[in-house]
Regions:
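N-terminal intrinsically disordered/low-complexity leader segments
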Residues: 1-19, 89-96
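Generic hydrophobic, amphipathic alpha-helix propensity
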Residues: 20-29, 45, 70-78, 82, ...
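Helix-turn-helix
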Residues: 23, 27, 31-65, 69
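Hydrophobic alpha-helical connector segments
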Residues: 83-120, 176
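Amphipathic alpha-helical packing segments from all-alpha helical-bundle domains
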Residues: 97, 123, 134-161, 170-174, ...
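Amphipathic C-terminal alpha-helical segment
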Residues: 113, 157-158, 177-195, 211-215
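Amphipathic alpha-helical segments used for helix-helix packing
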Residues: 115-134, 185-193
Length: 215
């Protein structure tokens, strides 16, 4: 065999302590982006980072540990996507109208992320987790709020401005969330998976309007 064609041994990289964890996490995020939660495998993450498999255990003792870290990063990315939509909201002279627009922006950001970053979206919700009272900043966006907290804040503002009756505020997160989350999966892998972009925009707009009016 020609020496030039011989497979060269993998080059092992050296990292400072924190840098290796970051490299492994970035590799895990890339895997999730490509194939969802099932693609997040510790051995493959170490291969992509260019280190021996045993090196990972100082930072992630198991695949589950890596998946939890990747999941937190995915939730943070989702929060940032929602924040970006909120930032685009044009403030109205009427506080209630601004509150409604903000709630719609939360739903719009959620759906956009689900469709544009499907692997990360699946990963974000791959493990059952408590959302109320979660103070893990690894799951938060630039505002320091995670996706659930951003939704809660939007609903609080709806109630404060009279756009949402105060007696209907408790638990409203789960009503709005279940509707938008359900639509996301109908588009990702359900009967709407073959819908055109125009059709998806139309049904998304109708659903967000329904959520706003139905709460």
């Amino acid at each position: 065999m020609n020496a030039a064609k011989k497979k060269r041994p993998a080059v092992r990289k050296t990292f400072h302590h924190g840098d290796l964890r970051k490299a492994l996490l970035e590799a895990g995020i890339a895997l999730a982006r490509e194939g969802g939660p099932n693609a997040v495998v510790l051995r493959e993450a170490t291969r992509r980072a260019g280190v021996a498999p045993n090196a990972a255990y100082r930072h992630f003792s198991s695949r589950s540990d890596l998946l939890q870290a990747v999941r937190a990063a995915a939730l943070s990315s989702l929060a940032r996507a929602i924040e970006a939509e909120i930032a685009r909201v044009r403030r109205s002279k009427l506080p209630a109208d601004s509150a409604r627009a903000t709630l719609r922006a939360v739903g719009t950001g959620y759906l956009k992320f689900a469709l544009e970053e499907t692997g990360l979206f699946r990963t974000a919700f791959s493990v059952p987790d408590r959302v109320e009272g979660d103070v893990d900043l690894a799951k938060a966006g630039k505002s320091g709020l995670n996706p659930f907290q951003l939704l809660s804040a939007a609903l609080d503002r709806m109630a404060e401005t009279g756009a949402l009756p105060s007696e209907r505020r408790p638990g409203a997160e789960y009503l709005a969330w279940s509707a938008v989350h359900g639509l996301a999966f109908l588009i990702i892998e359900g009967p709407l998976s073959r819908a055109s972009q125009k059709e998806i925009r139309a049904v998304s707009d109708r659903l967000l309007h329904m959520v706003e009016k139905g709460l």
